[in-house]
Amino acid sequence: MKLNISFPATGCQKLIEVEDERKLRTFYEKRMATEVAADPLGDEWKGYVVRISGGNDKQGFPMKQGVLTHGRVRLLLSKGHSCYRPRRTGERKRKSVRGCIVDANLSVLNLVIVRKGEKDIPGLTDNTVPRRLGPKRASRIRKLFNLSKEDDVRQYVVRKPLAKEGKKPRTKAPKIQRLVTPRVLQHKRRRIALKKQRTQKNKEEASEYAKLLAKRSKEAKEKRQEQIAKRRRLSSLRASTSKSESSQK
């Protein structure tokens, strides 16, 4: 089995192949996200603690968190699920995934170093890979440089050097996202004002409609009462004429 080990503190990653089954037994029957002591891997791993972050079986099917089995299952996956990327909006697909419990049928097991041990691992903890890009979001820049809300974030942006032969060296800065500027606040005020205007307009229209409805219902009621009174007058007139005719006979 191969072990794909990463160390986030240095940004390094190393793939090692372990032939001895006894060294791997410490990982068997463990679930994803479990922290395991890496001492059985060798003397250089003494004191190291690693977290199981995933893996793939011999056919390439990935492990999925929350599927409590050793084997493979077919799940109906949609947007937001791990092990699946939808190609269309709202698309769902039944995919084969492996359970989150480690066993001997895996070809690669992904591990993340949680605690460093006594010795350095060559190519993993002795070297540091600098990040290619700095943070882009305003809140993350503040967090990186421990800035307050009053500080100007734009002065602390990590710039990327662009070196070209025969040209003056220059740097490139990313566009800061979620930066609160006077223009953003103005847009927010305008949105709130427009919303208030819409609410007021809807209220006025609703009250006008209610008045019109009341007026129409009142008119309809008066008209109905007039018709009833007219019918009564006609019926009484007919009754009186029939009485007079009968008396003459």
Swiss-Prot record:
GO biological process, one term: ribosomal small subunit biogenesis
Gene3D superfamilies cross-referenced by the UniProt entry: 1.20.5.2650
Localisation per UniProt entry: Cytoplasm; Nucleus, Nucleolus
InterPro entries given in the database record: Ribosomal_eS6, Ribosomal_eS6-like, Ribosomal_eS6_CS
PROSITE patterns: RIBOSOMAL_S6E
GO CC terms in record: cytoplasm; nucleolus; ribosome; small-subunit processome
Alphabetized UniProt keyword annotations: Cytoplasm, Nucleus, Phosphoprotein, Ribonucleoprotein, Ribosomal protein
Region (Disordered): 161-181, 194-249
Extent of Basic and acidic residues compositional bias: 216-229
Disulfide bonding pattern of the chain: none
Biased composition (Low complexity): 236-249
Modified residue annotations for Phosphoserine: S235, S236, S240, S244, S247
Domain of life: Eukaryota
Role: Component of the 40S small ribosomal subunit. Plays an important role in controlling cell growth and proliferation through the selective translation of particular classes of mRNA. Part of the small subunit (SSU) processome, first precursor of the small eukaryotic ribosomal subunit.
Assembly information from the UniProt record: Component of the small ribosomal subunit. Part of the small subunit (SSU) processome, composed of more than 70 proteins and the RNA chaperone small nucleolar RNA (snoRNA) U3.
Family designation: Belongs to the eukaryotic ribosomal protein eS6 family.
Stated name of the protein: Small ribosomal subunit protein eS6
Organism: Xenopus laevis (African clawed frog)
Organism classification: Eukaryota, Metazoa, Chordata, Craniata, Vertebrata
